[in-house]
Amino acid sequence: MEKKQISKIDNYYNKLLKIHGVKPHALGCPKGRQSIRFKNIDNLIFKNCKILDFGCGFADLLNYLIKNHASYKFKYTGCDVVSNFIKISRNKHRGSKFIDLNSDSINEKYDIVTAFGVFNLKYTKSNEDHFKIVKKELSKLYNISKKYLLIDFQSPFVDYKQKDSYHQHLDPLIKFIVKNLSRRFEIIHSYLPYEFSILIRKDSQITKNNQFKL
């Protein structure tokens, strides 16, 4: 992602942070929506797994995991390009690792990589250019995941679209995933009417009896 796009993201969310404070609306997310989308990770968690929360915001996913999956003793890392989000998250969760992507980089792999709400703000003037960024970032995230990549998008099947919002069409996204990432994926379009998630599984090898490994 280029500096001008990172600057747009930083400016956009800092304005919301100034207006709303440390609340879901500062992330461009209505109250109550996060916990619903986070449920998509429930069946992926396993003992001692390493999780990367890409675009972590206020580390609300970590709050959810602690509340619902503490017994798995997972290792959480959050990262974001909005430095103020990282500062807030570090103060809230002093025992967890947070990466400010403006000054640090991701140097390891994770069992589960999530990206919630990351691609909802349109970074460019055209949808085509934004989708190029989506594909580039998905490739990076897929490469640092060991087992699962879980991402969400705003659905194209809506009654209206806000000015700077990005709604991902399914057909080009699926074609990209199948061709460049994995043939093992799930589309989850049943938990909210205006967004969907895609779970991409890293292991797409076929065994001798022509079945996917589990």
Where are these regions (language model features)?
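Conserved alpha-helix/loop element of class I SAM-dependent methyltransferases that forms part
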Residues: 32-48, 64
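Conserved beta-strand signature within the Rossmann-like core of class I S-adenosyl-L-methionine
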Residues: 145-154
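N-terminal, positively charged/glycine-rich alpha-helical extensions of SAM-dependent methyltransferases
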Residues: 1-22
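Class I S-adenosyl-L-methionine
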Residues: 161-214
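Short, conserved SAM-binding segment of the class I
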Residues: 133-140, 144
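A short acidic, Gly/Pro-enriched loop at the edge of an enzyme's catalytic core
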Residues: 105-113
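A short SAM/SAH-binding and catalytic strip from SAM-dependent methyltransferases
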Residues: 112-131
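Class I SAM-dependent methyltransferase SAM/SAH-binding core
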Residues: 52, 58-99
